[in-house]
Regions:
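An acidic- and aromatic-residue-enriched active-site/binding cleft used to recognize and process polar
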Residues: 11, 131, 167
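Hydrophobic (often cysteine-bearing) scaffold residues that line and stabilize catalytic clefts
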Residues: 16-20, 79, 171
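Metal-assisted phosphate- and nucleotidyl-transfer catalytic regions
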Residues: 22-155
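Short helix/loop capping segments that flank catalytic or ligand/cofactor-binding pockets
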Residues: 14, 136-139, 163-164
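Residues forming anionic-ligand binding surfaces in small-molecule and nucleic-acid pockets
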Residues: 1-10, 151-157
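Catalytic palm subdomain of template-directed nucleic-acid polymerases
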Residues: 7-19
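Extended C-terminal subregions enriched in glycine
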Residues: 158-173
Length: 173
C-alpha cells in the first residue's frame, strides 16, 4: 500500500487539496511525456486483456486516454456527508450489493464505496472532505460543527485512495 500524505505548515485544507491535485497531475503528465513507449505497451496489454471481457465490463477509455483525462479535468470534490448521501441512495446500497451497507453518517468508507464514487457515479478522480472526527486522527483540525475534521482523501479509478491529508489543528484550545 503506497499513498501520498501532504501536510504543509500554514496551509488550510483547500490549499492542501489543490497541492495534492496539482502534484498528481504533474506526475501523470510527466509519465505521459517521458514514458510513452511503456504506456503504449501497457495500454495495448490492457486492451488485449479487456477484449476477453463482456462489453459492459470493459473500460470506457484506454489507459493513455484515462491519464490524459486526469491531467485535463478537475477532480470532483464533495464532503463526506454528501458522499454518504450519494452512497446511501445508490442502487448497489439499496439492492444490498455492497458488502458493507451505508446506513448513514459515521460509516467508514470501504474500497467498494470509493470505487463506486470514482468509477460509476462521477467517472473522474474524487476528493472527499470533512470526515467525522471519530474516524480520523486526533491532530486534524475540528470544524465548527464539532462533528467533522478538515481531512481529505483523493480517490483514483482502479487504485482507490491515493492521497490522504488534513489541515492540522493549530488552535491551542
Amino acid at each position: 500500500f503506497w499513498m501520498i500524505e501532504p501536510e504543509v505548515a500554514f496551509n488550510d485544507l483547500k490549499q492542501n487539496i489543490d497541492l495534492a491535485e496539482e502534484f498528481l497531475k504533474f506526475c501523470v503528465n510527466y509519465c505521459l511525456k517521458n514514458n510513452s513507449d511503456d504506456l503504449t505497451f501497457l495500454d495495448n496489454r490492457l486492451q488485449d486483456e479487456e477484449s476477453l471481457l463482456k462489453k459492459e465490463r470493459r473500460s470506457e477509455m484506454g489507459l493513455i486516454e484515462r491519464l490524459r483525462f486526469v491531467v485535463e479535468n478537475n477532480f470532483h470534490r464533495l464532503t463526506y456527508r454528501d458522499a454518504i448521501e450519494v452512497l446511501k441512495t445508490s442502487k448497489p446500497n439499496q439492492k444490498k450489493k455492497f458488502k458493507y451497507l451505508i446506513k448513514g453518517f459515521g460509516a467508514d468508507l470501504q474500497s467498494e464505496h470509493e470505487r463506486y464514487l470514482v468509477e460509476k457515479k462521477f467517472k473522474t478522480p474524487v476528493v472527499i472532505t470533512d470526515y467525522p472526527k471519530n474516524i480520523k486522527a486526533f491532530y486534524m483540525r475540528v470544524n465548527d460543527d464539532n462533528e467533522t475534521v478538515r481531512a481529505m482523501d483523493v480517490l483514483f479509478p482502479v487504485v482507490g485512495e491515493i492521497v490522504g491529508g488534513s489541515q492540522r489543528e493549530e488552535r491551542l484550545e
